[in-house]
Amino acid sequence: AATRPPMHDSLPLLERTPFPAIRRATLDTLQVNLGYRCNQSCLHCHVNASPQRTEMMDDATLALIPRVLAARRPRTLDLTGGAPELHSGFRGLVRAARAQGVRVINRCNLTILLEPGQEDLAPFLADQGVDVVASMPCYSAANVDRQRGDGVFDKSIEGLRRLNALGYGQDGSGLTLNLVYNPQGPSLPPDQQRLQADYKRELAAHFGIVFNELYALTNMPIQRFGSTLVS
């Protein structure tokens, strides 16, 4: 795992703001955090997830989600964590949502596809037609391993290859593979379209990997990343 500095609380600084509350109009996407357990411990993580965290959504709460989908009819269920795939109810929830015709997004860190017991995860996602939004903070091994831990880049590349082999990111497959970039340090992301072109060129040239789109995100100034900003 990546080496972590001492934690500092950034929440009190964020609470001192006149920024108005944001209210939705209609419910289009239901995002659900299934828990804080993760097989990685990234320096930028805004929920402080790690293999040591034990907090996971309880079964009673999980059972409510298909009922909410049926009652409110959002178009998309967006599953995140931690590593959402580590929740014992993950696959059952995916099946229940897809049975209702709800689009499912799995926010995947890629290395989870190589974990013991998860060997059939990628085929499961493909069989269910789940959209994969995969964390890939750089196309450089040094930058990825600095943020996410030694060896994470190589495992991420292997995860992408497995998804590509199943049709993810391939034209006409109907299986969507989008990547997510986030800054390495206290800075804003570069232009998304230019960065996407760089990713497509470098990943194809060096690893034969294809994907659909790249999202350039700004890190949330809370938990580990917030701590680095005030350190």
Label the predicted regions:
Residues 28-35, 43, 58, 66-68, ...:
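Generic ordered-secondary-structure signal
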Residues 29, 49-57, 72-87, 98-117, ...:
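Core AdoMet radical
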Residues 64-67, 89-99, 120-123, 155-158, ...:
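Alpha-helical scaffolding segments of alpha/beta enzyme cores, especially the outer helices
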Residues 45-47, 58-60, 92, 119, ...:
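Surface-exposed beta-strand edges and their flanking turn/coil or helix-capping segments
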Residues 61-70, 93-98, 102-104, 117-119, ...:
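Amphipathic repeat-derived elements
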Residues 1-3, 126, 133, 140-231:
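Radical SAM enzyme [4Fe-4S]-AdoMet core and its adjacent flexible, acidic
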Residues 4-81, 85-102:
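Conserved alpha-helical substructure of the radical SAM core
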